[in-house]
């Protein structure tokens, strides 16, 4: 964050200083980072007093200041230097922090944080900062990681860790930028119409990227049409002097070209795009290979990330880098060198015993679940050797009235892709639908051996991650391939971590 005095921050957010004199507030400076975890605070930092599931940040204000925080942003006096903003009604937002906001204190601090980030972003843009916004139903984090890699040779990049993409993570990421930052990459998530427009007001992007319109959070939106309207808030927010990168292979995204005043850059897997990929092939770990075409030039790309769906993500990252002045050759080299970054997102690890773990446990929706299963099937069914495959799948959250049908489709898809073992983790109607869909599609749920399917080719439903892990530990064989995927709330990341940690021979991450 740029250096500001306590008094300056108070003026920006409309707060009053407490437990610090006006004279001291005019001289005390915030020189460190903004944090909402008191354990992460450092010298000169700004601590956000937010309510949580187990504790209220207001109760940890003193420890944050003792750890070096210059001041606390709070909704009430906390006995140490603070900027106090009055409680407000919680807006319709994503941030889980407001789930435990019983008195409006969390909403107040969050609103003040947005004001501070807005002011800082405006100063940095005036100094030459380029802000890039990314949205889409899936692929935002993977694209963000690739984009950070291709922009790094051009200047200093700030991007969110993991999926910090809501009303808390978005301004928090903005405030990581300094006067040395050249490129600020921001993910923009939504669960309601207007969410992306609100995020874009905090840090107006000069480049916007729309990846896809799928069915993630369908239960919250109500229809795919509303999802498309919400994603379109990003290209509508980009000014005429900016650029909007659209995935032309998704009709709902391609239609957004009519909704923006900015210049449109289309990416595609064929030559109809301004930036496009030549014939795509996959290696033995489902890592894409293709020729990148743009600006009458071309270069070979060998991605280090897993899954055919990563091609579109890479093309969007490439289009942004090209807009920022990189050459096609520079972009191809950076994409090829980019490793997987964010945890639990298509991380492929091969253990010393030959078991390959595909950890995509951070999140799941129907589109990303299909992509994960297709990658699993590709890795398991190589011409040189067919390997036994496991799909360990949990619930896809927030699908509303389509939840039963979508889970049923995923169970059936596992059978059609010839997955050897489907382990459905959890309880409830959606989980049952996934299991029953697999059984009905292939009649392989009983575990009975037939001429075509051995006794190990079954679909099973287990209660939780511990039960899934026990089953895997008992039955995995050297050379098996395991996909672990679910919405984050299912907690299957711990299963993937344990499978990798079980390796006693030394694992390899490609």
Swiss-Prot record:
Additional record remark: Was identified as a high-confidence drug target.
Keyword Cell division part of the UniProt annotation: yes
GO molecular function: ATP binding; UDP-N-acetylmuramoyl-tripeptide-D-alanyl-D-alanine ligase activity; UDP-N-acetylmuramoylalanyl-D-glutamyl-2,6-diaminopimelate-D-alanyl-D-alanine ligase activity
Protein's pathway: Cell wall biogenesis; peptidoglycan biosynthesis
Organism of provenance: Mycobacterium tuberculosis (strain ATCC 25618 / H37Rv)
UniProt xrefs under PANTHER family: UDP-N-ACETYLMURAMOYL-TRIPEPTIDE--D-ALANYL-D-ALANINE LIGASE
Protein name: UDP-N-acetylmuramoyl-tripeptide--D-alanyl-D-alanine ligase
HAMAP family: MurF
Cell compartment(s), UniProt: Cytoplasm
Family: Belongs to the MurCDEF family. MurF subfamily.
Described function: Involved in cell wall formation. Catalyzes the final step in the synthesis of UDP-N-acetylmuramoyl-pentapeptide, the precursor of murein.
Enzyme Commission code: 6.3.2.10
Main localisation: cytoplasm
Species lineage: Bacteria, Bacillati, Actinomycetota, Actinomycetes, Mycobacteriales
Superkingdom to which the source organism belongs: Bacteria
Keyword set, alphabetical order: ATP-binding, Cell cycle, Cell division, Cell shape, Cell wall biogenesis/degradation, Cytoplasm, Ligase, Nucleotide-binding, Peptidoglycan synthesis
GO cellular component terms given for this protein: cytoplasm
Gene designation: murF
